[in-house]
């Protein structure tokens, strides 16, 4: 197995991102959140966009999963959806993650995976939402399949907590590492994801988004004043 992939086995990856409207949506903040995650024991960082990735690279000596997002959409691919988006982040991550959903069809994702491999020596991670998409991405040459988009396409259901069934099904059907991502909220969730066959687990806002965490505590407490 690739040395980077081996280093991620049964380890935690931290996704460090913030949307517009979040007070942490500042490249300085993002880079230092990534550094804090690294100091806490993260095995890798997932981050978005040229500016943030460049700043993180200066502070963090860990593998980076690089993405280049367009505006989020339930109907159109938006995570590094085309070769232009991928080229913009070449050299900024050991792994480039791409939207490998069937939107509009599997051919788009297959061509994108192949073209990145032709042009760059990075690993390619396929962010998918269904078992069918994961199998197709692995066949197309993806080095990793991730459950990132389960519940975030118009044809998948958003589960409460991680999609453990999808993680298990993928780990049984594909010959590449399965990285579990999406709605991991507790250490118990992480253990369940690894037990279901995940190679490693990505956690984002439950570690790096203070606004989200605050809202979660208030919303789920029976005694706090709303």
Q: Which residues are covered by each model-predicted region?
A:
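Glycine-enriched alpha-helix->loop->beta-strand junction motifs that scaffold or abut catalytic
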Residues: 41, 60-64, 91-95, 118-121, ...
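Conserved, mostly hydrophobic/aromatic
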Residues: 37, 56, 137, 145, ...
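C-terminal alpha-helical cap/extension of soluble enzyme domains
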Residues: 2-24, 28-31, 151, 162-226
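Conserved N-terminal beta1-alpha1 strand-loop-helix module at the mouth
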Residues: 1-84, 91, 122-124, 132-141, ...
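Active-site-adjacent beta->alpha loops and helix N-cap segments on the catalytic face
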Residues: 23-27, 46-64, 76-83, 100-116, ...
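A short alpha-helix capping/helix-coil boundary motif
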Residues: 10-14, 32-33, 64-66, 92-94, ...
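Glycine-rich phosphate-binding active-site loops on the catalytic face of alpha/beta enzymes
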Residues: 17-19, 68-72, 92-105, 144-157, ...
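Structural motif
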Residues: 47-48, 67, 99, 127, ...
């Amino acid at each position: 197995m690739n040395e980077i992939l081996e280093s991620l086995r049964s380890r935690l990856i931290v996704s460090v991102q913030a949307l517009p409207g979040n007070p942490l949506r500042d490249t300085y903040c993002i880079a230092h959140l990534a550094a804090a995650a690294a100091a806490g024991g993260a095995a890798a960082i997932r981050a978005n966009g040229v500016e943030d990735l460049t700043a993180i690279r200066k502070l963090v000596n860990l593998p980076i999963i690089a993405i280049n997002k367009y505006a989020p959409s339930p109907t159109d691919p938006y995570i590094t959806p085309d070769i232009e988006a991928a080229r913009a982040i070449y050299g900024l991550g050991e792994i480039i993650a791409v939207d490998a959903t069937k939107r509009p069809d599997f051919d788009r994702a297959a061509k994108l995976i192949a073209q990145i491999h032709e042009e760059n020596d990075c690993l390619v991670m396929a962010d998918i939402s269904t078992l069918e998409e994961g199998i197709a991405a692995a066949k197309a040459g993806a080095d990793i399949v991730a459950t990132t988009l389960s519940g975030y396409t118009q044809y998948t259901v958003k589960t409460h907590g991680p999609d453990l069934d999808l993680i298990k099904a993928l780990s049984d059907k594909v010959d590449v590492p399965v990285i579990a991502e999406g709605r991991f909220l507790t250490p118990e969730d992480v253990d369940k994801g690894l037990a279901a066959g995940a190679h490693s687990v990505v956690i984002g806002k439950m570690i790096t988004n203070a606004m989200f965490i605050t809202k979660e505590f208030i919303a789920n407490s029976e005694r706090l004043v709303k």
